[in-house]
């Protein structure tokens, strides 16, 4: 196997893992693979040849060594490395396949064309108010142009979690972390059952074909004990990093959920409604309407507050108050005229009725004059 393939494989694993995962990969390569290959070869190369028993019985040493070490330390650690890296390699293969498939045009989902947004035109109210003889549509469509996509910002450095989430690999990544934890715990328990925490300097063997109780002696027991404890520490450290990585992903996911929720609430926060000017009647509209009522013989009902809708300045309000007093007088005279109309028909041409008509004409003239002044002020 060429080293270039191994280097490319490690690069891909590093690109599709978080910051904690990269630390785990560094410790795994240095303290497990390199330490097992370099240290194990020099320490355990003569473990069976230097295993000496005080007997000359053929086959007794082999049987006693098998009882002392059912599985060699180095072979156990090599098997541990293979099984622990298996979930990571499977995850990497799945990630590369999915990314390559997403880049393929045949498997890429077809994006639907976005429907144009329809909004009520801002000039709709003015068009309805126009009397140009044209029928205005019930709904005026105003196509809102789509916002141009902003150019992507320069890639911000992050811990790799966003890239994993963007590629849709988060579930598979967490699954391989859980598998790694299970394997780590299983191998730690098996290592304790097989070897304990110390390599004994001697071993008492009573197996057949040994003729009697045989004492056997192990080469470099202290060095092997130190190396065994180092491997325990490395396994515990890798297990802690894996658990820390899962906690990191969980807390980061919760934090992103809260941020997304806060952003969603800020977007949906109700805005202050835009005030629109309520259209009002022209200044002389109510007066003309009252004149029509008088011509039809209906009893006039003057809206004493109509002046407030048309004029807003102080001078016009004083004029309106003065005219309102005249209107009250005119109303009283009109009531008397209607009450006595049947008994004396000629009463309608009396000076009182003429005075009422004069007052009404003065009111109409004042309102029209004031309305023309307001219109000139608006145009100016």
From Swiss-Prot:
This protein's name: Gap junction gamma-1 protein
Membrane-spanning parts: 23-45, 76-95, 172-194, 229-251
Subunit structure: A connexon is composed of a hexamer of connexins.
Described function: One gap junction consists of a cluster of closely packed pairs of transmembrane channels, the connexons, through which materials of low MW diffuse from one cell to a neighboring cell. Participates in a developmental pathway for formation of the notochord and tail.
UniProt feature, compositional bias: Polar residues: 354-369
Keywords attached to this entry: Cell junction, Cell membrane, Gap junction, Membrane, Transmembrane, Transmembrane helix
Single Gene Ontology MF annotation: gap junction channel activity
Pfam families from the UniProt entry: Connexin
GO cellular component: connexin complex
Residue ranges annotated as Cytoplasmic topological domain: 1-22, 96-171, 252-380
Source organism of this protein record: Danio rerio
Gene transcribed to yield this protein: gjc1
Family: Belongs to the connexin family. Gamma-type subfamily.
Compositional bias annotation for Basic and acidic residues: 370-380
Region (Disordered): 337-380
rRNA processing keyword on record: no
SMART domains linked to this entry: CNX, Connexin_CCC
Membrane disposition: Multi-pass membrane protein
Source species, domain of life: Eukaryota
Keyword tRNA processing among record annotations: no
